[in-house]
Amino acid sequence: MLHCIQTIVAMINGYMNKIAWVDLSEKKIEYHEVDEDEALKFIGGRGLGGRILVKNCVGKDPLSPENLLAVMTGPLTGSDVPMANRIVAVTRSPLTGAFADSHCGGYAGPALKLAGFDGIVLTGASEEPVYLVAKNGELSIEDAKGLWGKTTFDAYQSIRRKYGATAVFYGIGPAGENLVRFANIMHFSRFATGGRASGRCGTGAVMGSKKVKCLVFLADMKRKPKPADKEGFKKALADALTKIKESDITGPGKGGLSVYGTGVLVNTINELAAFPTRNAKETQFEDAYYISGENLKGTILKKTPTCYKCPVACKRDVEVKEGKFKHKSEGPEYETLWSLGAMIGLGHVEAVAYLNYLANLYGLDTIELGNTLAVATEASEMGLIEEKIRWGDADKYAELVRKLIYREEEIGDLLAEGGAAAAEKLGVPEISMSVKKLSIPAYDPRGLKGMGLTYATSNRGACHLRAYAVSSEVFGVPYKTDPLSYDGKVDVVITLERLFAFVDSLNLCKFSTFALSKENYVVLYSTFTGVEITEDDLEKIGERIWTQERYFNQLHGFSRKDDVLPKRFFEEPSAKGEVYDRDAFERMLDEYYEKHKYNSDGTIPEETLRELGIL
């Protein structure tokens, strides 16, 4: 029996009060109201989706019909709040076996909300390919046999021709259909013509296992949610916009994100010797400038689109006009410039952009893809696979991408399982730069000590978006800390993981945290929903959401033994002679568990779970 959130949200503004539960095995759809108590405790998005997962998916195989995929919005989604444009897919990851939430910008979140839903929960599995259409508070299941096998972009074009230019696509490519364990979910719309991605954790494989090609959202602006406190919200909105516009990071036309996109970080992180290169055997890339945001702007940049209600416009659309890398697509973000650049020794921005284009076209997580190719290259150097793969060989990497998408040959099937599984099968798990089988992003913890604790304790594996310690270590937000010091990093990580859990459950872009304070989020939420909360409430909600996710992992056997880092970071020095100190790492874990009220083995005592209202 599925435990659905059923009690009506009668007094909280910002909800459509409708979550569609789809039994794909039986082709049945039920509509459930949103429980007010759950909404107050877990908000929406990542938090409410996580609640659904904890109640229904413990012990379920990630690629079985019993697993579910919850596609969720938050109470501010679709409103005038700047950067409240995200959508999130929540499930149990087929890549890691752990909690998974994968976020996407653009317009998919607002479109789902304006189609009349707070979320759609997919259960069971269809025997034949289908897609779902959300419109005016109703959901229909449609035949997708004509879409199955198409790339993400071709599938979107088919949907657009059938439903019109305003149709919003959120779906998978051949990688998801073929159950590649790091397949993503791609989004296309008039606000995301080049594409956006729910990239991490293999959510696209879960959608593919259910034989769902895509969700289609047909929005109605008449459904746009309005604030409970009109005048209070107007002031809160003005304050937030002023801060975003005045920030050196987010300011339109002047902030680094606006002028150069996320690629502005490439040179900065490289100079810190924190830019993992050639599978993190090195920490500085000699060709970093050529894959930087500065060089991208001067070479292949075509336009700088923005997501719905976002003044920052950090996105880059690119075009390579001729040659073997000819294409037009959403440009590579910082993480992709690194993962398909430095991590595999490739310093050619046109080639990096082309590999990114292939990933978007076929539906792959670019971070996991780059790490997986890095594992393959190092394994080739070690003579463990027959394929001859050299660092920086763009043509060979493009060939491998196509093979793994369709699981062609032994090498394609091996790499489709992800970098950690591939390394383990080859007998060298130590060459996978991963935590809980999720590969690292573009920050080497040897040069950014806070990121080591972030990766190790993250509920979804090595992830920079659980608690972006770089924010403190590089940007001084919310306060400055020394990148090479271990002191104070536990407090930084806990502060950010709670803030990010709250922001993710509102479904706001986390780039807003570079400019906005906790007070801003509290006032925006309070004036819009009509529910008065304090900064202490924000902290408690974030702690509850975070701990709920860790509890889900605990129920699947995760504990301190999984809060680890690849041994390369402990044993092999960076370009500046830095390693990650094991004793300092263990001390930080002890402090982290103590401040969270966990047991020393990283498990959560029942008392803590009850105190937070999780049990």
Protein language model features and the residues they cover:
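Short, Lys/Arg-enriched N-terminal segments with co-localized hydrophobic residues
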Residues: 1-10
